[in-house]
């Protein structure tokens, strides 16, 4: 900083605390209605001889800068705080549009002496001008055209999460214009935990909030950016009831809030809806987990669910769940959740069913609220639910929720080792998956210094963006546009593109690069061809509390992407059907341990159509340990044994040779292998006896996957470890995505439209390229060295 700047900073500090605030009483007024502004001047510790202003000057201009009102406002009150209201009475009714009000106290002996706020005169034509948002298998579409989302989360850069209670449309318009210039094409915002501030009692909604939301939507529309609005966070409000998902009073209150808000925007396609942020099924004390709530509504719903699934014969249920208690139909106790070496009084098979029950409860709740929103806002309004990575575990899962939503969403925060997997297991083939709240938590070293440099943070965010598209995602919504310095938690108080001083982090460049790439690529994109490989998520194993849960799927996704340039479609075992497997050449079922009869039947039907099915590890039966007809027909049932620390395998060595794999982390105490030697890939059902996905060594699993891909006739792009890659084929273009997780620059070889090319990928960065169908010519590419022909070495 130069000397004058430092001097100005010191002088301002010596002036002491002072604040001039101006806000509209209602941020949106109707045509012909006068806007009212409240001006507040605070001087917490006035100096003895100084004169605190008792009047402020107000100038209102339209959006072109033309003055439409000038006046003054009397400020009354003690010297420490004075306030007043001014009505904007123009010579004639103000036409629809955004207006900017500058408030000045020029005689104040301190700074700031001026502030600018804004308000809207409702513009019905602008609200009605929105694009028609729809969804297809892979994309969110705008008036029918593919729009890869490059979005952000935005509340406000001045008051942040208080933005709908302390509105300033002038600031919003400045920030939205900045976003538009950067290429942002969707903004996510909402209430999160502030729902109680707008409606404590069902039906009694705060009109000032609605007026502010009108202004926010109008400002977004003025800048051509659609809004996704979130209602709740973590748990829905119970409104005095016992269960937020099942209680009638809870559902009544939720219906009232959603109806009162959404009906205001009937026919307004600039806004659509996100039901709840990162939900759990749990009591308030158990957020971020999946636990019984313990109320009567839950008990009744559980009994009805069990009766529909198994009947209500206590003898049958005792046998099914190994439950000898006096109340086999009772909800599992919280202390039954989780794995232990000794079963004690726990009933893991019953817990497995309870977890499936909670998934169904939340999915039904989401479907109910989606129906309410469609009745209120219109049948074509889009509805999603922003779940975090807990949806890949036992919390409400995107794979199960998908039928209740228009598109799924995943918040990619913590799983930095498995970012591609995050997207794969949360995307269903029928609907788009949007990566929301993609950002970086803070990390510190032993002395509290930042773990990442600004440039390494930028590189990680770039990999997150690229992995979203590699996972067939519909786009990325970054968290958040502005750093929120008011956050009391250090972990969150530094997240965002733009710092409180107005400067931008290098991370912001990521959004611009991807926005520019997809602006050129979008006309060539459409829904992609189905993936030839399907990965089955063993949800029964996860819900039964088995160690390592679905970790086997992480290893498969990483190795397929890095070593073979193949990324699978993932399907939940609980939603597996033969029709969903119709396009698959290869179905991988990694270490399932137990498989429902419905899923086994789908696998059997697929195998009889010619699809190859690869299953690893022991399969004991269905989730209740019973043999089933389809498992018998697949030839998967055979009594196995616990793995030993070292097991022999024929994979990864020459024919007739033997390698050894290691099962550590006490796997010898909870993991079994099937009998027999390494599988021969004959027929259509292949059962590898070893759960190789959970072994320490990688190469045997790489060899097994490679042999399975070859036998199934799946095209691959083999490469050493470290750079994940895939090709996504649309009718007019082929999207290539490469992500380098190594510290060295690399060249990833891919065969595109018959042309072998080497794609340069910088260390810890990514490359996206769009190739023309038929010719393999590069149409668009993210910045980097040129692609070269692998045979000739030329561009």
What is each PLM-predicted segment?
Residues 108-186, 524:
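N-terminal carbohydrate-binding accessory modules
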Residues 37-42, 46-74, 84, 99-104, ...:
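Beta-strand-rich binding/interaction modules
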Residues 256-257, 366-382, 399-486:
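Catalytic-core region of carbohydrate-active enzymes that cleave or remodel glycosidic bonds
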